[in-house]
Regions:
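Intrinsically disordered, low-complexity regulatory segments
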Residues: 1-144, 148
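Single conserved hydrophobic/aromatic residue that forms the stacking wall/gate
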Residues: 147, 152-156
């Protein structure tokens, strides 16, 4: 059996019907963490290291995913097929690794589909891939640039 994570609860409900009882489909409800709100969340002097914090409103979603993974041996990240979706998958994987929610034997896959139809979802499940790190890096560059420059822009 596998745990599938999508972004929205409505998608989770529909996709669960398509995949059946061999899958547990849960929603992240968007991003699960963001840059810390304090100064220094991005450190240019330390290779632009970023300090992330989990969104307090997403704790129950993360707990549900962690709990589901305790009984399963596969994680399928099925967030949206864009830069933000790729970033959400990356954030989820990082959080789950830090919480030690993934066993050494847990397979992690990334799937994408452009429509919430049975055919699209089932076809995507046949074509898993890894997280697209260039997309994640584009997201990280945008987030760090915004964090570092927004206070300056607001002062002008």
């Amino acid at each position: 059996m596998a745990v599938v994570v999508v972004e929205s609860p409505a998608k989770a409900k529909t996709i669960n019907k398509y995949l059946g009882s061999d899958f547990v489909v849960l929603a992240s409800v968007g991003h699960v963490r963001d840059l810390a709100s304090k100064n220094g969340a991005v450190d240019p002097a330390n290779d632009f290291e970023m300090n992330w914090e989990i969104d307090s409103n997403k704790q129950k979603n993360i707990k549900a995913i962690v709990d589901a993974l305790s009984n399963e041996n596969k994680l399928i990240l099925a967030t949206d097929p864009d830069r933000e979706g790729e970033a959400i998958s990356w954030h989820l994987l990082e959080v789950l690794q830090k919480k030690r929610a993934l066993k050494k034997s847990t397979a992690v896959e990334r799937v994408v589909f452009n429509a919430i139809t049975k055919n699209s979802v089932l076809e995507a499940m046949k074509n898993p891939r890894e997280i697209n790190m260039p997309l994640v890096e584009a997201y990280l560059a945008t987030v760090s640039y915004t964090h570092l420059t927004l206070p300056t822009i607001l002062l002008v």
